[in-house]
A protein has these predicted regions:
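Glycine-rich His-Gly loop
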Residues: 91-95, 163, 226
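Alpha/beta-hydrolase-fold serine-hydrolase catalytic core, especially in secreted/extracellular enzymes
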Residues: 266-268, 274-329
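Short beta-strand element of the alpha/beta-hydrolase
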Residues: 83-94, 107
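Gly/Ser-rich "nucleophile elbow"/oxyanion-hole loop immediately N-terminal to the catalytic nucleophile
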Residues: 80-86, 128-168, 175-179
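N-terminal Sec-pathway targeting helices
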Residues: 1-18
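Short amphipathic alpha-helix adjacent to the substrate-entry channel of hydrolases
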Residues: 100-119
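The feature captures the conserved acid-bearing segment of alpha/beta-hydrolase catalytic domains
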Residues: 182-282
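Short conserved active-site loop signatures built around small residues
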Residues: 18-85
Length: 329
């Protein structure tokens, strides 16, 4: 049983590597202007795919004695002269995709008025590095010598992550001691329980710690994936016994639905898949609606919220998206 899962995973690793190479190629070619080449549909997705109004600055801090090496914090440059607090988004890294490789995504989110905090952890699935990153930015909020002194809106903190980082984001909220400080989450292409089962059997840095449990989520949650082969696979159910030619995707539709159903119905929750997009492209392709999600929950932007809620929620009829399910109690 494990053999077939791992054979499928070997194929998926090749596909995922191709997705990562594609993402790197896009980043190298388009750099910080990736959003100019996006293809959003609908007024809300289009608006929040573009840059916000803020110029962005970066502060870096060493994290000696840790596997994540340093903390990187992107923030609106106006913060340095402002007397108001800014909401925070922590980003949990996907496998090998540390913050320094995805600067454009951090900068984009910060341009919309967020303090965006990350690190160099390449194995973020437990949520430990995200928890440490949150603790660090909160310590700066209490430090009179820091530019962030009194500038962190501690009542409005969100977290996002892609792939392994999706698992890390969920675990940061549900398993870490400071998880109760988060107000909203966006988990992208979160590694499924079937793939997690196989990965948990491995030795070394990739072995163990891959499970996450959305039953414990009590904050608004937006979970996304793609319809491409690496994310979707070709098995439509949670099944470990696979026949030849069958592969479990990293984040298939059955997993999104399982995560959605596991979350309490008292919690606002949305799932959806990006049509024609695969695993490596999700962080860029979902960026507009991820930004809108956090603007609504952390900044009270009602226009952004109309992407998800109400009779005319834009994401329902957006040609870029399919398999959308919304619960807004």
């Amino acid at each position: 049983m494990i053999k077939w899962i791992l054979i499928g995973m070997a194929a998926l690793i090749g596909l995922t590597a191709a997705g990562v190479v594609l993402l790197a190629a896009i980043a190298n070619h388009k750099g910080a202007n990736y959003w100019r080449f996006a293809e959003p549909q609908g007024a809300i997705e289009t608006r929040y795919t573009g840059l916000g109004e803020y110029e962005v600055s970066l502060a870096e801090f060493d994290a000696p004695g840790t596997v994540w090496e340093k903390y990187e914090i992107w923030y609106p440059s106006d913060l340095e002269q402002s007397d108001k607090p800014y909401p925070v988004v922590v980003i949990a890294n996907g496998t090998g995709m540390k913050a320094s490789k995805l600067r454009a995504i951090y900068e984009h989110l910060a341009s919309w008025g967020f303090i965006v905090a990350g690190n160099e952890d390449e194995h973020a699935r437990t949520g430990a590095s995200s928890a440490a990153t949150l603790d660090f930015i909160l310590s700066l909020n209490d430090d009179p010598q820091s530019v962030f002194y009194g500038r962190v809106d501690t009542e409005n903190i969100g977290i996002t992550g892609h792939s392994q980082g999706g698992v890390g984001a969920v675990n940061a909220v549900t398993q870490q001691k400071n998880g109760n400080l988060y107000k909203a989450i966006c988990a992208q292409s979160t590694t499924s329980s079937a793939v997690a089962y196989a990965l948990n059997q491995l030795d070394g840095e990739l072995g163990g710690g891959w499970n996450c449990d959305t039953t414990a989520l009590s904050i608004p949650a937006f979970m996304v994936a793609g319809t491409g082969t690496a994310d979707a696979g070709n098995v439509e159910e949670n099944r470990l016994e696979l026949a030849g030619g069958e592969t479990q995707g990293i984040c298939p539709l059955w997993w999104l639905r399982e995560c959605f159903d596991a979350m309490p119905d008292t919690v606002p929750k949305v799932i959806g898949r990006l049509s024609g997009r695969d695993h490596g492209a999700i962080p860029i392709s979902a960026d507009g609606y991820m930004t809108a999600w956090f603007l609504y929950w952390l900044q009270g932007d009602e226009a952004a919220g109309r992407a998800f809620f109400g009779a005319d929620a834009e994401i329902r009829d957006n040609e870029n998206w399919q398999d959308v399910t919304i619960n807004f109690p």
